[in-house]
Amino acid sequence: MLNAFIIVWRESLEAMLVIGVLLSWIARQPAPAPLRRRLWLGVAAGLSLACALGAGTFAVQSEFAGASLDVFQLAMVLTAAALIMHMVLWMHRHGRHMKRELEGRAGAWGIAAIAALAVGREGAETVVFLYGLGLESQGMALAGLSGAAAAGLAAAGATAWLAARGARLLNYRTLFAASEILLLCIANALLANAADRAIALGWLPALIDPLWDLSTWLADGQGAGRLLADFTGYRARPAATLVLASLAFWAYALWRLKRPATAAPGA
């Protein structure tokens, strides 16, 4: 449930920040009313796109059975992990310049397009993430997942409101840096779940299984161990393949995060 809350909070916050930047720009224009209408038209289009993707995902799933369903579900979990990685890396590189870039692209229909793409992209990613989390939890109750998503949306609204009011206690850079680590932990948990599934189905060799056994000290089926398993991909008795996959994931993520941004031409 915590994973769903964090994902919806972060995704919704990004969309709200984009809308907030555009509203701020619109308020400074001589005729803001038509621009504001275009903005909300774009938001509605983005929400429609996200809803269509959600309906399409479940419609496609209903067409699969047996091995085909296993492939589809595994692909969705891996897609969710990859999208989280992409989102973290993109925001890490572009987040500090987002306000200037958005205002530079703003225009009558440009506002609608930016809003539609922002809301549609974040909404579509959220659909994939929540679907992947539902598979990871092996049938997480719909009510619990919906409640966590609603709480994440409310928290994003509160965070955006605080940011708009210039709350001194809200350090945006620290907030996003912490959320990057949290989201990468969730992505690694999805990757671990996908590796477990692939090994169980015989699609990946386990190599050494288990590579070690920490179940006596911290079992992953209950209490703190279960929380770590759901949130970070911790396994008390991991297969060597899973450990290698996680090491590769974190090595790539840290390398990309630490890599200096490419200088703009002519800078």
Task: Name each model-derived stretch.
Residues 1-267:
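Multi-pass alpha-helical transmembrane bundle typical of ion/small-solute transporters
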